[in-house]
């Protein structure tokens, strides 16, 4: 990306093998020679400007794909560690124990300069912390702990005596988050990590975890599960009137069914904070803020 397009050796040029001719020969077995031989090069040339335009226009998405899928998978195989585990090793050697702010800054630096972490990031983080401080919730439920980044943001902003329950479905990821949370200085009485899928945990919150109401909920796991989990919270009467539900990644990768439900059911006041992805500001995303009016 960003470099001039050049002809590849072997594609065109006098005296050089033409790869398109090989394609023509293969296709000519099933199609008339005159039709294939005259149309294939023309079609290829016609589509070339379109391909180049798409690559330029969506270069940020291409970089994200390479960084989060291809390079990450390669590093996972070579190191035997997941990206969250590599990030935690970096935190251990560069961050100050007991200082959640410094740990968060260290994770931001890791994501910007080492490997993209797919975390909430500082811009969205400021929105989250401001809302937690503003609402002063007695109990917060987070669905999707991941590496623990947003968990630390919430824990920092909780009022005295506040409680945070955070749910992570992957045991290996949860183990990393648990160590990060304790490294930051938050004990189990303040921040409790539950390992399990949100679909299984939500129905058990009242009986097994003594959570009768969640004043603030953060949805930050899989956007396609947001609507299901919101309806589960409603069905089990875990949202009091006035409760705040925050949902990340509602624009990218997007949660259209969740947003449509929140806007049309008549039980929520909705607001959308437009942001970009951390380290990819050109890719537009947003945080949805829902205020629950009650079951009526």
Curated annotation (Swiss-Prot):
EC main group: transferase
Any one GO molecular function term: catechol O-methyltransferase activity
CDD domains from the UniProt entry: AdoMet_MTases (cd02440)
GO BP, sorted A to Z: catecholamine catabolic process; developmental process; dopamine metabolic process; methylation; sensory perception of sound
Record EC number: 2.1.1.6
Keyword Isomerase annotated: no
Superkingdom: Eukaryota
Transmembrane segments: 36-56
Catalyzed chemical reaction(s): a catechol + S-adenosyl-L-methionine = a guaiacol + S-adenosyl-L-homocysteine + H(+)
Cellular compartments per GO CC: apical part of cell; cytoplasm; endoplasmic reticulum; membrane
Binding site for S-adenosyl-L-methionine: 142, 144-145, 150, 168, 198
Record keywords: Catecholamine metabolism, Cytoplasm, Deafness, Endoplasmic reticulum, Hearing, Membrane, Methyltransferase, Neurotransmitter degradation, S-adenosyl-L-methionine, Transferase, Transmembrane, Transmembrane helix
Recorded family membership: Belongs to the class I-like SAM-binding methyltransferase superfamily. Cation-dependent O-methyltransferase family.
Function per UniProt: Catalyzes the O-methylation, and thereby the inactivation, of catecholamine neurotransmitters and catechol hormones. Required for auditory function. Component of the cochlear hair cell's mechanotransduction (MET) machinery. Involved in the assembly of the asymmetric tip-link MET complex. Required for transportation of TMC1 and TMC2 proteins into the mechanically sensitive stereocilia of the hair cells. The function in MET is independent of the enzymatic activity.
Self-association and partners: Interacts with LHFPL5, PCDH15, TMC1, TMC2 and TMIE. Interacts directly with TMC1. The interaction of TOMT with TMC1 and TMC2 is required for the transportation of TMC1/2 into the stereocilia of hair cells.
Misc. remarks from the entry: LRRC51 and TOMT were originally considered as alternative reading frames, LRTOMT1 and LRTOMT2 of the same LRTOMT gene in primates.
Record protein name field: Transmembrane O-methyltransferase
Organism of provenance: Macaca mulatta (Rhesus macaque)
């Amino acid at each position: 990306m960003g470099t001039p397009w050049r002809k590849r050796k072997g594609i065109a040029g006098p005296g050089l093998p033409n790869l398109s001719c090989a394609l023509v020969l293969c296709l000519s077995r099933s199609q008339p020679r005159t039709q294939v031989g005259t149309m294939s090069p023309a079609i290829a040339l016609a589509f070339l400007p379109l391909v180049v335009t798409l690559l330029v226009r969506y270069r940020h998405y291409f970089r994200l794909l390479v960084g989060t899928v291809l390079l990450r998978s390669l590093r996972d195989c070579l190191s035997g560690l997941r990206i969250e585990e590599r990030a935690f090793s970096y935190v251990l050697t560069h961050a100050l124990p007991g200082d959640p702010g410094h740990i968060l800054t260290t994770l931001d630096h890791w994501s910007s300069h080492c490997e993209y972490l797919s975390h909430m990031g500082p811009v969205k983080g400021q929105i989250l912390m401001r809302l937690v401080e503003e609402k002063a919730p007695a109990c917060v439920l987070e669905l999707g702990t991941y590496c623990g980044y947003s968990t630390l943001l919430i824990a920092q902003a909780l009022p005295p005596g506040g409680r945070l329950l955070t749910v992570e479905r992957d045991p290996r990821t949860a183990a990393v988050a648990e160590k990060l949370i304790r490294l930051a200085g938050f004990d189990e009485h303040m921040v409790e990590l539950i390992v399990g899928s949100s679909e299984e945990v939500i129905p058990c919150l009242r009986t097994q975890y003594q959570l009768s109401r969640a004043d603030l909920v953060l949805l930050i796991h899989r956007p396609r599960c947001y609507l299901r989990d919101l309806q589960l919270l409603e069905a089990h009467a875990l949202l009091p009137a006035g409760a705040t539900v925050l949902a990340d990644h509602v624009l990218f990768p997007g949660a259209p069914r969740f947003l449509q439900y929140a806007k049309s059911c008549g039980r929520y006041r909705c607001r959308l904070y437009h942001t970009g992805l951390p380290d990819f500001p050109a890719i537009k995303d947003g945080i949805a803020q829902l205020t629950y009016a009650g079951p009526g």
